[in-house]
Swiss-Prot record:
Source organism superkingdom: Eukaryota
Gene: MT-ND1
One Gene Ontology CC term in the entry: mitochondrial inner membrane
Keywords, ordered alphabetically: Electron transport, Membrane, Mitochondrion, Mitochondrion inner membrane, NAD, Respiratory chain, Translocase, Transmembrane, Transmembrane helix, Transport, Ubiquinone
Name used for this protein in its record: NADH-ubiquinone oxidoreductase chain 1
Length: 318
């Protein structure tokens, strides 16, 4: 039975990822005053299927000097971790209801760094290695603020369990009392998922394509799927943390509709940001985090520690 539940979660995620690639190309197309893909199927709707067939039927080339095992394991690990991070998300009921769901998600997102590092190192190409080092430095740096922001939100929530966030936000979204955190969280998720304007890992002008430059066909598609699954997952996480939808146990469908709408709007805002902003310089990216975000989040975390105590507000303890 559990395997059926797992499949019922994984298949829709992969479908959502496939169509997110199409939505991205369409949105970017219309923002640049062109049509986007419109040849394969009606309005280009079958484009993701054509892309998948093309990628998975290509020969998976590998460089002669690469270390084979790591080269093959890295993309599989990337996708496996991206899908694992969905398990504790309440939509409205999680696949596995964990006591420390938030901690689990932080741990999984930290492990994702290894797949990037291995892929860059195993490719044995200087471009891939530089791209991987950039990606790792960026991901690890922005995880610091993500963790502190999470801690601040959880101080209002009262536990590390994700479903209690729904109870916490029955009367008010957490974006209202902690909007500076929400803004920094959104920008940090952009950096964490390597999206524009923080897509330094795949700076075409200087690094050709970044850490996945030596990958072709199937393994490349796995990295691609992992990246987009992470984007959707991060937006869903943002919705749960800051824009909690109202959950009526008698009609869980209403929660799902509400929640999916918010997550889709956030995902489209990711694409909007990509179409609007130029790429950051690497030192600007690091300055933004270590000199702007970190002091601010630390100060706000201390404020979130004191605020419930001052107002004698007890978080929901159920």
């Amino acid at each position: 039975m559990f395997m059926i539940n797992l499949l019922l979660m994984i298949v829709p995620i992969l479908l959502a990822v496939a169509f997110l690639t199409l939505v991205e190309r369409k949105v970017l197309g219309y923002m640049q005053l062109r049509k986007g893909p419109n040849v394969v199927g009606p309005y280009g709707l079958l484009q993701p299927i054509a892309d998948a067939i093309k990628l998975f039927t290509k020969e998976p080339l590998r460089p002669l000097t690469s270390s084979i095992s790591m080269f093959i394991i890295a993309p599989i690990l990337a996708l496996a971790l991206a899908l694992t991070m969905w398990t504790p998300l309440p939509m409205p009921y999680p696949l596995i209801n964990m006591n420390l769901g938030v901690l689990f998600m932080l741990a999984m997102s930290s492990l994702a760094v290894y797949s990037i590092l291995w892929s860059g190192w195993a490719s044995n190409s200087k471009y891939a290695l530089i791209g991987a080092l950039r990606a790792v430095a960026q991901t690890i740096s922005y995880e610091v603020t993500l963790a502190i922001i999470l801690l601040s939100v959880l101080l209002l929530n009262g536990s590390f369990t994700l479903p209690t966030l729904i109870t916490t936000q029955e009367h008010m979204w957490l974006i209202i009392p902690s909007w500076p955190l929400a803004m920094m969280w959104f920008i940090s998720t952009l950096a964490e998922t390597n999206r524009a304007p923080f897509d330094l890992t795949e700076g075409e002008s200087e690094l050709v394509s970044g850490f996945n430059v030596e990958y072709a066909g199937g393994p490349f598609a796995l990295f691609f799927l992992a990246e987009y699954a992470n984007i959707i997952m991060m937006n869903i996480f943002t919705t749960i943390l800051f824009l909690g939808a109202f959950h009526n146990p008698l009609m869980p469908e209403l929660y799902t509709i509400n929640f999916v709408t918010k997550s889709m709007l956030l995902t489209i805002s990711f694409l909007w940001v990509r179409a609007s902003y130029p790429r950051f310089r690497y030192d600007q990216l690091m300055h933004l985090l270590w000199k702007n975000f970190l002091p601010l989040t630390l100060a706000l975390c201390m404020w979130h520690v004191t605020m419930p105590i001052i107002t004698a507000g007890v978080p929901p303890l159920t």
